[in-house]
């Protein structure tokens, strides 16, 4: 084959991409991505040599003559090993399969580790040496980022993840550009300065605050602006519910991003309902195209074989869909704890590609007390690493701040957490607007009767099953149900109706899972909350007398305890309940700062250090040969796998247009973002029952559509088996 005629990809319409063009294009992108954390040469080399196995005659026969499949990714890894660059060897070997386990010198060629793959390549003796006609010989990189020297292995493994993300995203983007013949609609986002100006112009329309509550919110806002001038690092924003954290934290993020040249703002939030509301607020202020709302996850890797060849025409359908996976390239991202932290510890390419875009960002961890206890230490370690070595600023933003400073202080030289609003006691006193009381409830029927005595009332349950069963006991005008079995656009419509009825003084009785308890802007005169962790109870209390229009003693949050066998309640739900009961015995005011501190201190003490990293993630990453694949499998904030189901709506033109595109095989990032508004997450066992009863239509590569209209209730959403009823939200 003549020099310059080596092919990297082919398209469905017969076009060919020269291999050298793909290598150079990927190299330029990966170099730019890695320069954010002072590793441009590492990114450049990863991109330039990642596909040199395609120079082999065997691969060229594969792509031009439909020959047998060829492993083309191990060749570049072997070349990197020869210059003693193991991180690049691992990234290149893994760029299709996902991050491999490192392995050891004793690894077998069949075990799937990097060392095993390299042995296999040596035995196979695939000749790709003609790469020298178009590429220079690689030379050792003399300089690594300073933060890697003299550190433990966690720094090293995190650096590998960042490099891998740079390579995978660059590879996907360059391939996407070719597949779409250069017609890729990317970028076009507003600059951070433009977003800054949009926000402050919007905020100026509020005028001078006239009520005591709005004056206090203005004080908090100003403290956030003042703190934004401070050096990047770790901050906390401890403000009770109703203090205006959402806009104040955005003001901090925008001003800080301008001053310190941060490339994006990422909000990390525990509940989809808060994500939906927060993203709506930001889109209204900053423009729809500048904000990505990312929570549902379509996993194309489930159907992506580790020996997959992305270069043949018959594979282009799957390839296009993988290319459409989210990479967080917008200036403002609103996502979940699950998406954020599982991506940081992921192995699959579609989840890892976004990780490098976290670097040099302002990270707002809303409701930081919801960080999952079984993974608290690895989550904190990764947050600390992003702040210490990847130019991030992080804000722990909550109404009930857990005691996390101790854990951050153990990272490296120690990260100091700076409180933006230091008068915590004063703020708790000012924003106290409800009275908590405990009550006995012997049945859902009794509870329903209690709720019917109120014209406007909110009741929050611990499980989707109880929420649905209780709702079905309620009758009459103005009764509403909320849970994540309702697709996001459905929940938005119901919340809009609820807000309007509350404003108009009409009957409004709402039964909800805990999705409503934090960050959702509603104001009820009376609230009922099933007993839960103290932070959850106080969050729910924030939906009562939010604007201070009633006397505190008249605004009752009733905490009820339904009789249930404790051995049937999962430990992660039971433990916070028991600690709440302990704290309530010792503290007359369960919502005081002292009570909250006592609750979190006891919770973390009860769990113990080991249970704050229940899968030994940190220990396994602090060894010389980390097992990336196994760690990714074990790092699951939601233990049970979930699937997403698209809900067709006959009278919704946007919904039908999206569905038609999905059925025709059209799939890009824009379509997936729109489709998210009509998707419902279900656990694997619930998914199987829908599948077994022929209620689903399987589209390509992991997408499913509900086909039975009766399986989606217009009031309560997707009808599935409710036996596993504890409410967990993606």
Residues covered by each model-derived region:
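Accessory nucleic-acid engagement/destabilization modules that flank
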Residues: 1-201
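Inter-Walker segment of RecA-like/P-loop motor cores
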Residues: 287-345
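Interdomain hinge/linker at the junction between the two RecA-like core domains of SF2 helicases
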Residues: 399-452
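SF2 helicase catalytic motif II
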Residues: 337-341, 349-389
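C-terminal helicase lobe and adjacent C-terminal extensions/tails of nucleic-acid helicase motors
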Residues: 88, 387, 446-454, 460, ...
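Conserved Walker A/P-loop ATP-binding site and its immediately adjacent core
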Residues: 262-286, 295-298, 403
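Walker A/P-loop
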Residues: 231-253
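Conserved helicase motor
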Residues: 8-13, 272, 292-304, 462-465, ...
């Amino acid at each position: 084959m003549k020099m310059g005629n080596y092919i990297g990809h082919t398209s469905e319409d017969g076009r060919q991409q020269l291999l050298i063009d793909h290598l150079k294009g990927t190299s330029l992108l990966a170099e730019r991505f890695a320069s954010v954390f002072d590793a441009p040469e590492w990114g450049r080399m990863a991109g330039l040599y990642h596909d040199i196995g395609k120079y082999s005659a065997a691969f060229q026969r594969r792509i031009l003559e439909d020959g047998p499949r060829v492993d083309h990714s191990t060749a570049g890894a072997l070349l990197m090993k020869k210059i003693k660059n193991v991180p690049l060897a691992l990234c290149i070997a893994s760029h299709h399969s996902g991050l491999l386990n490192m392995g050891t010198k004793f690894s077998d060629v069949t075990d799937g580790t990097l060392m095993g793959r390299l042995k296999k390549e040596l035995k196979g003796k695939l000749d790709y040496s003609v790469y020298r006609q178009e590429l220079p010989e690689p030379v050792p990189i003399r300089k690594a980022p300073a933060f890697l020297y003299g550190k433990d292995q966690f720094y090293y493994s995190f650096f590998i993840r960042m490099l891998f993300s740079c390579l995978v995203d660059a590879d996907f983007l360059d391939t996407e550009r070719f597949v779409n013949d250069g017609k890729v609609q990317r970028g076009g986002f507003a600059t951070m300065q433009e977003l800054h100006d949009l926000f402050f112009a919007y905020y100026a329309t509020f005028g001078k605050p006239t009520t005591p509550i709005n004056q206090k919110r203005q004080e908090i806002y100003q403290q956030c602006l003042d703190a934004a001038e401070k050096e990047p690092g770790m901050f906390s924003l401890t403000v009770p519910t109703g203090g205006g954290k959402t806009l104040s934290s955005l003001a901090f993020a925008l001003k800080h991003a301008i001053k310190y040249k941060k490339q994006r703002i990422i909000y990390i939030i525990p509940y989809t309902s808060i994500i939906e509301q927060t993203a709506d607020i930001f889109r209204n202020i900053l423009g729809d195209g500048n904000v990505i709302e990312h929570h549902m996850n379509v996993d194309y890797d489930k159907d992506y074989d580790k020996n997959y060849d992305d270069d043949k025409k018959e594979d282009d359908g799957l390839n296009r869909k993988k290319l459409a996976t989210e990479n967080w390239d917008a200036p403002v991202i609103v996502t979940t704890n699950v998406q954020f932290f599982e991506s940081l510890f992921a192995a699959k390419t579609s989840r890892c590609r976004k990780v490098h875009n976290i670097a040099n960002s302002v990270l707002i961890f809303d409701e930081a007390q919801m960080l999952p206890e079984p993974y608290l230490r690895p989550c904190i370690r990764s947050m600390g690493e992003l702040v210490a070595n990847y130019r991030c600023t992080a804000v722990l933003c909550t109404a009930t701040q857990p005691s996390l400073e101790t854990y951050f202080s153990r990272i490296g030289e120690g990260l100091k957490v700076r409180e933006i609003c230091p008068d915590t006691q004063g703020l708790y006193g000012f924003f106290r607007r409800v009275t908590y009381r405990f009550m006995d409830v012997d049945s859902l029927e009794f509870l329903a009767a209690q709720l019917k005595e109120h014209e406007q009332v909110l009741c929050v349950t611990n499980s989707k099953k109880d929420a649905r069963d209780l709702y079905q006991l309620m009758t009459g005008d103005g009764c509403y149900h909320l849970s994540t079995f309702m697709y996001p656009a459905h929940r938005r419509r119901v919340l809009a109706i609820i807000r309007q009825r509350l404003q108009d003084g009409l009957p409004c009785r709402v039964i909800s899972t805990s999705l409503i308890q934090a960050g959702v802007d509603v104001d009820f005169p009376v609230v009922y909350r099933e007993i839960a962790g103290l932070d959850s109870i106080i969050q729910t209390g924030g939906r009562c007398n939010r604007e201070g229009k009633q006397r505190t003693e008249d605004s009752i949050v009733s905490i009820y305890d339904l009789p249930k066998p404790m051995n049937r309640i999962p430990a992660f739900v039971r433990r916070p309940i028991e600690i709440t009961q302990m704290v309530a015995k010792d503290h007359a005011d369960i919502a005081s700062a002292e009570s909250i501190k006592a609750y979190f201190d006891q919770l973390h003490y009860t769990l113990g250090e080991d249970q704050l990293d229940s899968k030994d993630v940190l220990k396994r990453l602090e060894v010389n040969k980390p097992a990336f694949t196994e760690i990714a499998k074990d790092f699951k904030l939601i233990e049970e796998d979930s699937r997403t189901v698209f809900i067709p709506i006959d009278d919704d033109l946007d919904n039908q247009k999206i569905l038609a595109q999905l059925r025709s095989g059209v799939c890009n990032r824009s379509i997936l973002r729109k489709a998210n508004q009509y998707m419902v997450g279900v656990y694997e066992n619930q998914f199987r029952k829908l599948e077994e009863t022929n209620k689903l239509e399987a589209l390509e590569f992991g997408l499913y559509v509900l086909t039975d209209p009766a399986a989606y209730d217009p009031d309560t959403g997707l009808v599935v088996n409710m036996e596993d009823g504890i409410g967990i939200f993606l």
